[in-house]
Amino acid sequence: MPSFTQPHSAPRNFQFPGQQRQGDPTMGTINAELADKGFLVTSTDELITWARTGSLMWMTFGLACCAIEMMQMSMPRYDIERFGVAPRASPRQSDLMIVAGTLCNKMAPALRKVYDQMPEPRYVISMGSCANGGGYYHYSYSVVRGCDRVVPVDIYVPGCPPTAEALLYGILLLQRKIRRNGSIER
């Protein structure tokens, strides 16, 4: 029987649900007795959190040139779906929004409306200098100086425009943050 406690192909920082409690002597005994029978003992919250990190559904909110790099991330060279992140077109089916580009004052209510349509728990990645703080157009009268003034942002990806690798790293950081917090609600 394969052992579920020691995965052979998992990355170094990967943890199956329940591994956070391996130091507990009671859980260690139960896990040891059931591991050779093909069972995994965990809590519901740990299982949901583990599943959530591997099934992020993202939607684009591309406003400028950063959106090109965001599209490149889902192409075969980087293949973001191998990390458990798949694109969705509807905000009602996605739990991650990537804001890429310059957010102007007229577009801010639309961003908030789309964010409010997303189901909980929902996450936001701010991609690029313009989305992070206004960027090149920071002093313009019509530009919002960062999308965090409209929606709460979880991860900031710097650059003008940031590379697809930087966005991919930001998504991996978000997965690590979800795994570390381990909460269903924000």
From Swiss-Prot:
It is found in: Cell inner membrane. One of its GO terms (molecular function) is iron ion binding. Residues 1-27 are annotated as: Disordered. Its EC number is 7.1.1.-. One of its GO terms (cellular component) is plasma membrane. Binds 1 [4Fe-4S] cluster. NCBIfam families: nuoB_fam (TIGR01957), PRK06411.1 (NF005012). NDH-1 shuttles electrons from NADH, via FMN and iron-sulfur (Fe-S) centers, to quinones in the respiratory chain. The immediate electron acceptor for the enzyme in this species is believed to be ubiquinone. Couples the redox reaction to proton translocation (for every two electrons transferred, four hydrogen ions are translocated across the cytoplasmic membrane), and thus conserves the redox energy in a proton gradient. This is NADH-quinone oxidoreductase subunit B 2.
